[in-house]
Curated annotation (Swiss-Prot):
This is Serine/threonine-protein kinase MARK2. SUPFAM superfamilies: KA1-like (SSF103243), Protein kinase-like (PK-like) (SSF56112). Belongs to the protein kinase superfamily. CAMK Ser/Thr protein kinase family. SNF1 subfamily. ATP binds at residues 59-67, 82. Keywords: ATP-binding, Cell membrane, Cell projection, Cytoplasm, Cytoskeleton, Developmental protein, Differentiation, Kinase, Lipid-binding, Magnesium, Membrane, Metal-binding, Nucleotide-binding, Phosphoprotein, Serine/threonine-protein kinase, Transferase, Wnt signaling pathway. The modification Phosphoserine is found at residues 40, 91-93, 212, 274, 408-409, 453, 483, 490, 512, 514, 535, 562, 656. Its cofactor is Mg(2+). Coiled coil: none annotated.
């Protein structure tokens, strides 16, 4: 395989040719069998192993996919492993999946989730990506409400830098929205979900109409062809408005109403929005796509650079890869790798275990860990090959230089195609902007070798616990590619005067009904007009089976019967007109009842269980983890951890919540009725706050809608007497 990265071939949007593994072919690694053969049988440890990874827990699931939190055995680094069942996908979906993987391999930006390794067998594809412990921007807004402009600017500079980087590589994302913006442990942005991304060439129009309706450009609603970048620019305008106002500029009770508002291009300007921010919005939200600003122009905008006058935002320059770091090379040699195979894997960009190990060694998982690395010798081939199914094909591996690499698992679990990611942290130089972030099982991630983020610092508020999903799973192919959305006829051909910006925003004291507030930052929400599993949030795709014209007048969240019976994984109580596959696997399909086993195992307060006397003693002597996470004064205390756990259990019981003790100071909690919109699962953990003589309660959502989680989490937090 050539050491140079080959350009991605342009794909016909409507091509449905069955992809062969030749699309991603590469020379088999000498380690391939080892990766697939190492499993739980090879270790005395009861936790399952995949290759060089120990699977810790499921952090996301969907109809055809699971995402697992895993630990790289050789370096101790945590990774996210997405397991995709290819047998559930048709040829068109497979083609899009492989295109997504190829595109992610060429992206190396500190604010884009990094794909680290790809393993392919005959039936399953495993993607190993960064693990974003901070959850989605969507969840952050639900928990905290709108951002102050300083904080929004910090996030938005990172978003624009990453999207402009994609555009300069002639890649368009096409599904930018708050749900696809992740936060790492330091609250830096990571753009995820390249399932609808594609290459573009100016002059050759794209004609696939996809995206999430509130973020979709007007030309998509009109069924017009487009170059590519201009649809991302419109979506960025919606994102900016959402960050600053906590609401959407365009919304409606059904798709028809939403479409009409987008095509009018009118939105309200809240009284608290600065004039500079309002002027910047006018460069994004222009009905005529040819008149929208380019991201290079937007980088020079006044609002974008307030507080950064000496550091104007500029296009990101990708650093040269570092394939000859003597420290990492020597460490790998001590593990049993040879210098030749290390160089071959890196230069050939193979995305194999060798490259993954090298890249993982380049990063420390947490500032709290420092640079200490616990290294283990490489498993012998004899040990790991005994039960290895030989994969008939392998995915090409080509990695950019400095990502935190992680490997994927080869366990036969259902999976959904998507290129999701998990976030590597970019460096923030402004100490006053640091804040405790929510940490879901992994400590704050930090990057040693990755170039610093385009943003020197992030301002952050200390408020209520952030509902973090920890796994942002995107769904590229699994977004119902077979479920219709906007077809040109059904959307109609409303005419818009070209060359005329009809936005004419009006200032009003509060957001208008068309701009539904996501949440307020105080107290439990009284409204649920920013739900996750409804059509207004769902990503749509041309060529889906259901006809929009039959649904345009239905309220969001009401789904007509599917003529094909092809409803894949709805996230809301009753699903949505568009398959909610881009939202993420973390949201379980609430139409399907929770498995009996799952509910029955969540008995209240199961402590300790069986085990040896030694294990029980270790359990009793365990101490809370020292973590950085989003906390508030209501959930911190100088009480002893055991007293805090008793208080938490008391409040959970009072609110009819089931709980199960997973670790000494961590409870898995469930509230609501399986199969209903109020059903939610989350973790509550008593943690020690670093550098403070206080303990705090960490909340982390596992599944369920953002609003359902916020309702119960806020109620419990308010009732805790800590």
């Amino acid at each position: 395989m050539s050491s140079a990265r080959t350009p991605l071939p342009t794909l016909n949007e409507r091509d449905t040719e069955q992809p062969t593994l030749g699309h991603l072919d590469s020379k088999p690694s000498s380690k391939s069998n080892m990766l697939r053969g190492r499993n739980s049988a090879t270790s005395a440890d009861e936790q399952p192993h995949i290759g060089n990874y120990r699977l810790l827990k499921t952090i996301g699931k969907g109809n055809f996919a699971k995402v697992k939190l895993a630990r790289h055995i050789l370096t101790g680094k945590e990774v996210a492993v997405k397991i995709i069942d290819k047998t559930q996908l048709n040829s068109s979906s497979l083609q899009k999946l492989f295109r997504e993987v190829r595109i992610m391999k060429v992206l190396n930006h500190p604010n884009i989730v990094k794909l680290f390794e790809v393993i392919e067998t005959e039936k399953t594809l495993y993607l190993v990506m960064e693990y974003a412990s901070g959850g989605e921007v969507f969840d952050y807004l639900v928990a905290h409400g709108r951002m102050k402009e300083k904080e929004a600017r910090a996030k938005f500079r990172q978003i624009v830098s990453a999207v402009q980087y994609c555009h300069q590589k002639f890649i368009v994302h096409r599904d930018l929205k708050a749900e696809n913006l992740l936060l790492d442990a330091d609250m830096n942005i990571k753009i995820a979900d390249f399932g609808f991304s594609n290459e573009f060439t100016f002059g050759n129009k794209l004609d696939t109409f996809c995206g999430s309706p509130p973020y979709a450009a007007p030309e998509l609603f009109q069924g017009k062809k487009y170059d590519g970048p201009e649809v991302d620019v419109w979506s960025l305008g919606v994102i900016l408005y959402t960050l600053v106002s906590g609401s959407l500029p365009f919304d409606g009770q059904n798709l028809k109403e939403l479409r009409e508002r987008v095509l009018r291009g009118k939105y309200r300007i809240p009284f608290y929005m600065s004039t500079d921010c309002e002027n910047l919005l006018k460069k994004f939200l222009i009905l005529n796509p040819s008149k929208r600003g380019t991201l290079e122009q937007i980088m020079k905008d006044r609002w974008m650079n307030v507080g950064h006058e000496d550091d104007e935002l500029k296009p990101y320059v990708e650093p040269l890869p570092d394939y000859k770091d003597p420290r990492r090379t020597e460490l790998m040699v001590s593990m049993g790798y040879t210098r030749e195979e290390i160089q071959d894997s890196l230069v050939g960009q193979r995305y194999n275990e060798v490259m993954a190990t090298y890249l993982l060694l380049g990063y420390k998982s947490s500032e709290l860990e420092g640079d200490t690395i616990t290294l283990k010798p490489r498993p012998s081939a004899d040990l790991t090959n005994s039960s290895a199914p030989s994969p008939s094909h392998k995915v090409q591996r080509s990695v950019s230089a400095n990502p935190k690499q992680r490997r994927s698992s080869d366990q036969a679990v259902p999976a959904i195609p998507t290129s999701n990611s998990y976030s590597k942290k970019t460096q923030s130089n402004n100490a006053e902007n640091k804040r405790p972030e929510e940490e879901t099982g992994r400590k704050a991630s930090s990057t040693a070798k990755v170039p610093a983020s385009p943003l020197p610092g992030l301002d952050r508020k200390k408020t209520t616990p952030t509902p973090s999903t920890n796994s942002v799973l995107s769904t590229s192919t699994n977004r119902s590619r077979n479920s219709p959305l906007l077809d040109r006829a059904s959307l109609g051909q409303a005419s818009i005067q070209n060359g005329k910006d009809s936005t004419a925003p009006q200032r009003v004291p509060v957001a208008s009904p068309s701009a539904h507030n996501i949440s307020s930052s105080s107290g439990a929400p009284d409204r649920t007009n920013f739900p996750r599993g409804v059509s207004s949030r769902s990503t749509f795709h041309a060529g889906q089976l259901r006809q929009v014209r039959d649904q345009q007048n239905l309220p969001f969240g009401v789904t007509p019967a599917s003529p094909s019976g092809h409803s894949q994984g709805r996230r809301g109580a009753s699903g949505s007109i568009f398959s909610k596959f881009t939202s993420k696997f973390v949201r379980r399909n609430l139409n399907e009842p929770e498995s009996k086993d799952r509910v029955e195992t969540l008995r209240p307060h199961v402590v300790g269980g069986g085990g040896t006397d030694k294990e029980k003693e270790e359990f009793r002597e365990a101490k809370p983890r020292s973590l950085r996470f989003t906390w508030s004064m209501k959930t911190t205390s100088s009480m002893e951890p055991n007293e805090m756990m008793r208080e938490i259990r008391k409040v959970l019981d009072a609110n009819s919540c089931q709980s199960e003790l997973h670790e000494r100071y961590m409870l898995l909690c469930v509230h609501g009725t399986p199969g209903h919109e109020n059903f939610v699962q989350w973790e509550m953990e008593v943690c020690k706050l670093p550098r403070l003589s206080l303990n705090g309660v960490r909340f982390k959502r596992i599944s369920g809608t953002s609003m359902a989680f916020k309702n119960i989490a806020s109620k419990i937090a308010n009732e805790l007497k800590l």
